[in-house]
Amino acid sequence: MNVGKAFLDGIVITGGGTYNSIQICPELMKKIKELGYKIKLDTNGTNPTMLRRVIDQGLVDYIAMDYKAPLNKYNEVVRADVNLHDIVESMETIKNSGIEYEFRTTIVEQLLSPVDVEIIKAEIGSGEKYCIQKFNPTKTLDKDFLKCSTFSPQIMQNLINTTKGVFKEEILR
């Protein structure tokens, strides 16, 4: 990473495997910070203890949390038994951290409706930044998702327009 210093100003830590490892993540992040890089952490919000730890240690400069579905259908959408309290706790930790952040939802039409997106926004409440991301079926680990799609561009834009002002910034990606 020292060689890349002329080209890089930050590193993104992403992927559940790295983030969920209590031993590896903070140590790796400390080394990255010692090299003078900023760190963006991508999280699914399932490990609020780790999240608080890296925030408290000053190891993260930006946090992006995937908020995948309304809480009442979260486990169905992610196809796993997620502790919903952890999702809410992570969200609140991020909002109260003083660190720049965003929440984001990737729209898979077969899993989420426009009403679901409105529920997600209400569950998050006000905040810094909310991103609605188009689902790309060509980049998926689960082959079942190759048959899935995202909403039309008009519907995606409407999802942003319906709650202008709730978040300081709403983005369509």
Range-by-range predicted roles:
Residues 1-10, 19-159:
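Conserved AdoMet/S-adenosylmethionine-binding subsite of the radical SAM
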Residues 153-173:
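Charged phosphate-binding loop/patch that engages nucleotide di/tri-phosphates or the phosphate backbone
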